[in-house]
């Protein structure tokens, strides 16, 4: 009898350990595949997506609406001498292996010049904001970031990587933002890509991270947010684009 009790206890212990292991694996899998909510749901912006401007911003906010374009539910980005980001917060979530979306240009911004402050606008961009540890940020930029955080009262990301629809810039060009090196942009589309046509994108996030910020951290840090945006506050013109189907993948 004692042996039987011992066997039963051992089996129960094994089952409990297995159940705990399966639960942990399920939680880790769920975290690894955490997704931003769909950009569009039931004819409106998806739950959790919010429009955010700059502290003390004087320019109007970029307008984000919903449209059906060629049968696709899409977000309409209209920038008119405006600034504003469509943000989905993902604090502490692991970065995805792949980032996918579709976009099309309707009215390009021919005044864009991503290398200069006066041309630093985009008719469409998709970004990931990363929670890079401050000790990885170069000293001078770290001090500027700390000051900006204290002035704004917001936890501004230490690293943001954007994939941008530019103008005259070459495809795959990598550029630091002219206002802050805490933002790097990779140009995917430009004036040679025809308006009124959908383009499907798929990016290797780790490869693009290493290319952009690899000198600061070879390891991809956790996310802070996913961002879809358009702005025209520097160029003062109007642009229109659509973005659809933003999703993470292996």
Question: Could you say what each language-model-derived stretch is?
Answer:
Residues 62-84:
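Short carbohydrate-recognition loop motifs
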Residues 15-30:
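Bacterial N-terminal signal peptides
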Residues 121, 125-179:
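Extracellular/luminal beta-rich ligand-recognition
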Residues 34-57, 139-147:
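Extracellular carbohydrate-recognition regions
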Residues 226, 244-248:
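Extracellular beta-strand elements of beta-rich domains used
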Residues 76-96, 107-114, 180-189:
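Secreted extracellular polysaccharide-interacting domains
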Residues 89-99, 192-195, 219-220:
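Extracellular/lumenal carbohydrate-interaction signature centered on repeated Trp-anchored short motifs
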Residues 124-126, 181-191, 195-236, 240:
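Extracellular beta-strand ligand-recognition surfaces/modules
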């Amino acid at each position: 009898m004692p042996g039987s009790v011992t066997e039963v206890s051992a089996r129960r212990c094994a089952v409990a350990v297995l159940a705990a292991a399966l639960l942990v694996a399920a939680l880790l899998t769920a975290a690894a595949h955490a997704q931003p909510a769909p950009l569009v749901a039931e004819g409106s912006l998806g739950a959790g997506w919010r429009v955010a401007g700059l502290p003390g911003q004087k320019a109007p906010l970029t307008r984000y609406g919903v449209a059906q374009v060629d049968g696709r539910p899409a977000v309409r980005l209209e920038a008119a001498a405006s600034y504003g980001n469509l943000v989905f917060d993902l604090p502490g979530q692991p970065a995805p292996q792949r980032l996918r979306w579709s976009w099309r240009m309707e009215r390009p911004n021919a005044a864009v010049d991503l290398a200069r402050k006066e041309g630093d606008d985009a008719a469409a961009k998709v970004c990931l904001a990363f929670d890079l540890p401050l000790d990885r940020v170069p000293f001078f930029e770290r001090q500027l970031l700390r000051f900006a955080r204290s002035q704004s009262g917001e936890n501004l990301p230490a690293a943001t990587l954007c994939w941008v629809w530019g103008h005259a810039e070459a495809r795959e060009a990598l550029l630091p933002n002219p206002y802050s090196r805490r933002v790097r942009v990779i140009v995917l589309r430009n004036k040679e890509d025809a308006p009124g046509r959908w383009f499907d994108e798929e990016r290797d996030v780790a490869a693009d991270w290493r290319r952009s910020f690899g000198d600061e951290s070879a390891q991809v840090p956790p996310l802070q947010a996913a961002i879809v945006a358009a702005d025209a506050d520097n160029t003062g013109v109007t642009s229109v684009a659509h973005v659809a189907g933003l999703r993470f993948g292996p």
